[in-house]
Amino acid sequence: MKKTTSDIGMNKTGIGTSPIDSADITKAAQERQPSHLGDDTLILKVRQQYALESGGVGSVPPPSSLKGVAKTAVDMLKGSKPTVFIDKLGERAAFERTGTRLYQGALAKFEVLGSWEGGPTREGLERILNDELSHFGLVTEALVKLGADPTAMTPCADVAAVSSMGLPAVVSDPRMNLRDTLHALLVAELTDNAGWEMLIELARGLGHDELADRFQMALDAEAQHLAMVRGWLSAGVTLEARANPVPQAEATNAPTPLV
């Protein structure tokens, strides 16, 4: 695995590395024009048809306890739709579970590659990992308290899982170094912060002020995570851009500050 990503090498993805062949291809494309000057109207109709026929990505399961059934009925009588809150809680649970695995992968690469000046520390990565796991427990507890099944895959949880599929792929790819992994973590933290903000707003709007206060503590921690990851990545990119970069620190000698 390479520790840097910006070294010059045998990258042949661009046409500039083969001017003769690329000129032939360009000439052939100009000589053989498309047989039909169509647009995307037909494919748009197909997509619309699929959208009309689709049954969606699932549904929120019914309450798993009598308490949940009663609470749902009361909330609906008040004019609110509690299943929306359950759905978004399921989304948070799925994302925090994924976040835990992302930081487990980051720690594995840290152990192999070490860190750099101003880069991640073992203590910092472990702190965030433990926070993610704690947040997963918090959301699970909230779901149980509301009488919902925390093991169910809600529609928003499904969407979150699909939309973030690329993040675990980056972290687990042996070709990706620790800086590449931090880029994936930065994307995750940006999404995570926005997700908690919306969940808190929804909780307060539905009268779950106690839960909202606890969620705010989670958001405060997530804001710290975002600052830490952004700082680590920025330090790594800046260091690599130097003409004579400082050698990468060994994992056992990684700096102790968390940020």
Which residues does each predicted region cover?
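Non-heme di-metal
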Residues: 2-259
